[in-house]
Design a protein with these regions (language model features):
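Helix-loop "lid/cap" segments that line or gate small-molecule binding pockets
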Residues: 33-34, 53-68, 123, 156
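Short, acidic loop-to-helix structural element flanking the phosphoryl-transfer center
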Residues: 84-111, 117, 121
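Metal-dependent phosphoesterase signature
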Residues: 62-98
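Phosphate- and divalent-cation-binding pockets in alpha/beta enzyme and binding domains
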Residues: 29, 57, 95, 119-122, ...
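Short beta->alpha linker loops
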Residues: 25, 49-53, 78, 91-95, ...
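Asp-based, Mg2+/Mn2+-dependent phosphohydrolase catalytic module
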Residues: 1-9, 101, 116-193
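Helix N-cap/coil-helix junction residues
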Residues: 39-41, 67, 129, 160-161
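Active-site neighborhood of HAD-like aspartate-dependent phosphohydrolases
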Residues: 1-48, 181-182, 192
Length: 193
């Protein structure tokens, strides 16, 4: 069972790998794009970059692997298209989803995701969590991505809650860093999955 810090007034949930079991499907989509183009997407790198926008991840991957002739933005968009074709396979991560269900309507709750808005909304639909949240902040809504705290600070602002009174549920190191930098309490859900 997940231990929730006391003295909270609001929850902010990361989506991919926290509220929804999307990470294996995102990785599969990444692999399909890379394999189609003749290279591999290292699984360790994928999980290290968890929480960052797809386009940024692919752009960084091209640089890190010194792969020339590919546009990280185009590959990222292609990966998102493939993910959306596979989205019906997404299930909620029940240990976290049950927390959201039990607090629905009792406290303000938000999504703070590094995903694109369209993908986030379709993922929430796939797991039947649309209309659960007072705020949804995606990479389309901020200038700086996780590990910068902007995503979570914007979610707190939109809920009208002081950042120090928010608990963030996260599965990625960049998101955990972002929550701490925002002065929020954070639950690393990887300990419970």
């Amino acid at each position: 069972m997940i231990k929730i810090p006391s003295d909270f007034k609001a929850f902010i949930f990361d989506l991919d790998g926290t509220l929804a079991d999307t990470m294996p499907i995102h990785y599969k989509a990444c692999q399909l794009v890379c394999n189609k183009n003749g290279f591999d997407f290292p699984e360790e790198y994928f999980y290290q970059e968890a929480g960052k926008p797809t386009i940024e991840v692919f752009t960084n991957l091209m640089q890190e692997l010194e792969i020339k002739g590919f546009n990280g933005s185009e590959l990222g968009q292609e990966k998102e298209k493939i993910f959306l074709e596979l989205i019906s396979m997404v299930e909620p991560l029940h240990i976290v989803a049950d927390i959201a269900k039990s607090y629905k309507g009792k406290i303000p709750m938000a999504i703070g995701s590094g995903g694109q808005r369209k993908t986030v909304e379709l993922t929430l639909d796939a797991i039947n969590f649309n209309n659960f949240f007072d705020s949804i902040v995606t990479c389309d809504d901020v200038e700086k991505y996780k590990p910068d705290p902007e995503t979570f600070l914007k979610a707190a602002f939109e809920m009208g809650v002081d950042p120090k009174d928010c608990v963030v549920f996260e599965d990625g190191n960049p998101g955990i860093e972002a929550a701490k930098a925002a002065g929020m309490m954070v639950v690393d859900v990887r300990e419970f999955l």
